[in-house]
A protein has these predicted regions:
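Active-site neighborhoods and metal-handling regions in enzymes and metal-associated proteins
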Residues: 1-294
Length: 294
């Protein structure tokens, strides 16, 4: 189903923001991860949008869901492979983008593999295509470079205030009941290429969360925090550093996580510690092609 002009306008505004932020982005060894994340998020706001999720800064074997912690002292390393995954929304309509920087200058082919896979995948998107075909194209491209796709990370459909709205876009030749794309669908395609075995696992570190639904708690501060989070972020992911700036609020957040009101997104790491690259675009599915939102 075709979207209305207001929806399309907001998607385009969000896309212009993420494109502008990424074009202006400079990554160098020694940069503070915390300062970089805050700079990206403030830049999104200064351009008229809001962050759709915390700026993800995932280095080397860390593939996804990594953002700065409160008081984070980490620095970008001299030879890091740095994945920057950002999202902006305008009235809930989201643009989701990612690029990778190779500070060593030694991993160009790894970056090329995921970027080429993205371009090839976008080229076959149209109404009526099974998402399995997209996964096949991504895997074929990445393997042609001698690398593996990360099989348990996927692209996804987008909805208003929904970063993941139900449809998964595989990054490998999945066999099963893949969804059929329809005209007007908005999807984020994000191939991950790796020198490792192609599987990510959860780590013990978590900085990103999202509201699910409110469950009973005796903690008044926790109840108030949940209402605040829902009003401000809806179901979109948020960072602990955005909401828990005091001991009381940290305790409140932990109570909400413990009782299931808040969902956690642990940092994901390639299982064999292989380097990972990522590129991502948001596209609108059209009758005979796809519109790249840039």
């Amino acid at each position: 189903m075709k979207m209305d002009e207001n929806e399309l306008s907001n998607y385009k505004k969000a896309a212009s923001i993420t494109t502008s932020v990424l074009k202006e982005l400079k990554i160098a060894p020694g940069m503070s991860v915390l300062e970089l994340a805050e700079k990206i998020e403030k830049s999104i706001e200064s351009k008229g949008g809001l962050p759709a999720f915390p700026a993800n800064i995932s280095c080397n074997e860390y593939a996804a869901h990594d953002t700065a912690a409160v008081g984070d002292t980490r620095k970008i390393g001299e030879k890091d492979v740095v994945k920057i995954d950002i999202g902006a929304h305008v009235d809930g309509y989201i643009s989701d983008r990612a690029i990778t920087f190779d500070l060593s200058g030694e991993n160009g082919k790894l970056l090329e593999a995921s970027e080429k896979a993205l371009n090839n995948a976008v080229s076959i998107v149209k109404a009526g295509v099974n998402v399995e075909k997209i996964g096949e194209e991504i895997e074929k491209t990445i393997r042609s470079y001698g690398f593996r796709p990360v099989e348990n990370l996927t692209g996804h459909s987008l909805g208003k205030y929904l970063l993941h709205s139900g449809v998964e876009i595989p990054n490998f030749s999945a066999r099963g009941k893949g969804a059929i794309l329809e005209e007007g669908d908005v999807i984020a395609i994000e191939p991950f290429a790796t020198k490792g075995i192609g599987i990510v696992v959860e780590t013990q570190r978590t900085e990103i969360f999202s509201a699910v639904f409110e469950l009973p708690t005796r903690n008044v501060a926790a109840r108030n925090m949940f209402k605040e989070i829902k009003e401000k972020y809806h179901e979109l992911p948020f960072a602990e550093r955005w909401v828990a700036n005091s001991f009381e609020r940290k305790v409140a957040l932990r109570d909400l996580i413990k009782n299931g009101s808040i969902h956690s997104y642990p940092v994901l790491k390639e299982k064999s510690n292989g380097l990972v690259s990522q590129f991502e675009h948001t596209v609108i599915v059209e009758k005979d092609s796809a519109t790249l939102l840039i």
